[in-house]
């Protein structure tokens, strides 16, 4: 299957139906899908070119070119399924020189010729342990950026200055989920996620370093049904932290709720949640964080971030 698409939205176009729609854009896309093994293995190869050069008032229009490869393997019921996606995204604003003042002194470097590599790998593994049906989902996503001007030989006569900082952050995410269905009306989900952001920075010696910011989270949620699924009780807890140092933050949350089908299309819902923050540095920061008249102490480590209860009555037409 081959898809050819051309889209152009002028700078004067606005819509209230979709306020997030981007105007002043022109895009050409071509995709080809190939299926093998009786449609159990599919590949999608595509290319798109996008720019915002539709108006004379646009200075230094940005051109984006994307090459993509998506592959999916679904052998059949009860077998693991695998997804692998890859995108190479290039951006160029057409600027080929740096800005200088009237005396020829350097002002700034607005050139952009960057390349991003976005990869996604996902595998879903179904299985059973006795009467319990389980599905394990593993995901890995990585986005890395490269400054072409810094590495390509065609820019050798106009290289970057030593104090230039390429301000694009790499990211990496790993997640895992275990979904279980029991022989009685109970379903549970155990989740784990770790996200790392590598922010480029420059030290006092003009060496580029990357500062890592990472968040790790885990959660457990479950639902139980009563009276032929007319009453559904939900509960869960989650935990998130950015490390184990004195400056780190831990967030612990709990939730509970229920849905009750009063009539055929009338549903009564009750949901409640509470979230706590643990900030160890509050113990010795010289500030009365909990407003109890005492400066510093064990009681200032934990605090309630938010809590609430929502009661609603919904009718489905």
PLM region spans:
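Exposed, low-structure sequence patches enriched in small/polar residues
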Residues: 1-284, 290-294, 300-317
């Amino acid at each position: 299957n081959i898809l050819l698409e051309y889209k152009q939205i002028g700078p004067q176009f606005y819509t209230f139906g979709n306020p997030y729609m981007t105007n002043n854009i022109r895009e050409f896309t071509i995709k080809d899908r190939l299926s093998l093994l009786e449609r159990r293995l599919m590949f999608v190869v595509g290319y798109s070119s996008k720019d915002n050069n539709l108006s004379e008032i646009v200075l230094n229009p940005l051109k984006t070119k994307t090459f993509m490869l998506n592959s999916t393997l679904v052998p059949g019921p009860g077998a693991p399924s695998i997804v692998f996606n890859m995108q190479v995204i290039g951006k160029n604003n057409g600027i080929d020189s740096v800005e200088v003042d009237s005396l020829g002194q350097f002002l700034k470097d607005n050139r952009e010729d960057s390349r991003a590599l976005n990869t996604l790998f996902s595998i879903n593994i179904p299985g059973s342990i006795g009467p319990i049906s389980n599905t394990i989902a593993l995901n890995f996503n990585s986005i890395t950026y490269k400054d072409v001007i810094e590495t390509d030989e065609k820019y050798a006569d106009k290289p970057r200055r030593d104090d230039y900082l390429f301000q694009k952050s790499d990211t990496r995410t790993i997640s895992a989920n275990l979904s279980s269905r029991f022989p009685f009306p109970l379903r549970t989900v155990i989740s784990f996620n770790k996200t790392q952001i590598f922010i480029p920075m420059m030290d006092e010696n003009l060496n580029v370093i990357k500062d890592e910011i990472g968040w790790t989270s885990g959660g457990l949620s479950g639902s139980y049904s009563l009276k032929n699924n007319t009453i559904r009780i939900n509960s869960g807890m989650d935990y998130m932290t950015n490390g184990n140092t004195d400056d780190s933050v831990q967030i612990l949350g709990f939730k509970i709720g229920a849905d009750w089908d009063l009539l055929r299309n009338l549903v009564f819902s009750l949901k409640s949640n509470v979230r706590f923050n643990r900030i160890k540095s509050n113990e010795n920061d010289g500030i009365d964080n909990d407003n109890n008249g005492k400066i510093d102490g064990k009681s200032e480590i934990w605090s309630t971030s938010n809590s609430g209860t929502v009661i609603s009555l919904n009718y489905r037409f």
